[in-house]
């Protein structure tokens, strides 16, 4: 006989759907789904994940607390949590074609920036030295960004950081200067990773530079991990000591992160033949928990396991090939329209447009594009002084490729971007000379009826609606 003691209203609170329980939140979610459906999503760090991943994310796996590692938890009842985490680890190694004797992986990291910090703390002391690609040159905040005025990233507070940069003329990483500066700075960690660098990284050269100063080579492949898993671009695993990645960008999984670490022999003494073994596994696992985190997000690990199975499929490889082909088509059309691209193009999933020769900044173009249902982001380009009004526009292909865009569609995107840039120039030119700030530009658009903006918004919404957003089954289940 049941001794259920909760009231019927409390029982209903636990069992009712979102729409029944909280219409206010449901309505906001409904509007966001509509925004995604009616928008051309060009943010390079975004993607459109699968129904199966959504199903795993919104599951009872979220109920369980599980500090520790599989087989060594601080709570009971984790036999199935252990099972899913081990499965996720195995699938991660398989997705990137790795030998478990040579590589291990931690799948508990909550996000990419914390994962990078966890690695740094695991392998070097406070005030240890780190070199990463400068943010305005295509790097990431978590690679130790700071300005002459302040330390921006917490990484630059805990560690001594020095940037390396691209050649201003070519837009390519200046490996020669990096090598010279590494000899002077002598970092403990050399980070090879980017957030707005469109060309391939020479991992072999990076390995040689790291070895010349006795540094660990840490590769942050957050943006390009899906391309690497599908072998569309070269893998860093042949050269790296540690590889980190987020899981929601080109990998098309849930929002999380992974840390891959070397196992086995690190080096052999040329004179004695004595082997030095890697000791990364325990250090990195300890840095993740208990160093920086408590219990992992088991629903995310479950969803990641699903995404990694998909990443090992032939369909996923075909998708990644299309991601790059679409980026190349976008590159070609933008060049035909007269635009300058940083590094003169792309080898990956995005292009970085240098708007400075045209006389407009990325912030204004980003804002106007948003008014016509195209979302992308302003981005610093080499030589920029301001992050708020940078000279670049970053355009990525993963999300719309997931929705079914092909090369002709991205050529059409380039035409829309071109029209937005021209509109920006017209609107700015219509303002008094003293009204030269972003707020003046935005106010003009907000208070004026500009027919072409309204026409483009409707045209793009209708066009985007013809490409499915893979949330329909989830949406119906949620009552949205």
UniProtKB/Swiss-Prot annotation:
Its cofactor is pyridoxal 5'-phosphate. The modification N6-(pyridoxal phosphate)lysine is found at residue 249. PANTHER family: SERINE HYDROXYMETHYLTRANSFERASE, SERINE HYDROXYMETHYLTRANSFERASE, MITOCHONDRIAL. Disulfide bonds: none annotated. The keyword Disulfide bond does not apply. Belongs to the SHMT family. SUPFAM superfamilies: PLP-dependent transferases. GO terms for biological process: glycine biosynthetic process from serine; tetrahydrofolate interconversion; tetrahydrofolate metabolic process. Pfam families: SHMT. NCBIfam families: PRK00011.1. This is Serine hydroxymethyltransferase, cytosolic. Its main location: cytoplasm. Pathway: One-carbon metabolism; tetrahydrofolate interconversion. One of its GO terms (molecular function) is glycine hydroxymethyltransferase activity. It catalyses: (6R)-5,10-methylene-5,6,7,8-tetrahydrofolate + glycine + H2O = (6S)-5,6,7,8-tetrahydrofolate + L-serine. It comes from Neurospora crassa (strain ATCC 24698 / 74-OR23-1A / CBS 708.71 / DSM 1257 / FGSC 987). Its EC number is 2.1.2.1. In eukaryotes there are two forms of the enzymes: a cytosolic one and a mitochondrial one. Interconversion of serine and glycine. It is found in: Cytoplasm. It is an enzyme of class 2 (transferase). InterPro entries: PyrdxlP-dep_Trfase, PyrdxlP-dep_Trfase_major, PyrdxlP-dep_Trfase_small, Ser_HO-MeTrfase, Ser_HO-MeTrfase-like, Ser_HO-MeTrfase_PLP_BS, SHMT-like_dom. Keywords: Cytoplasm, One-carbon metabolism, Pyridoxal phosphate, Transferase. One of its GO terms (cellular component) is cytoplasm. Homotetramer.
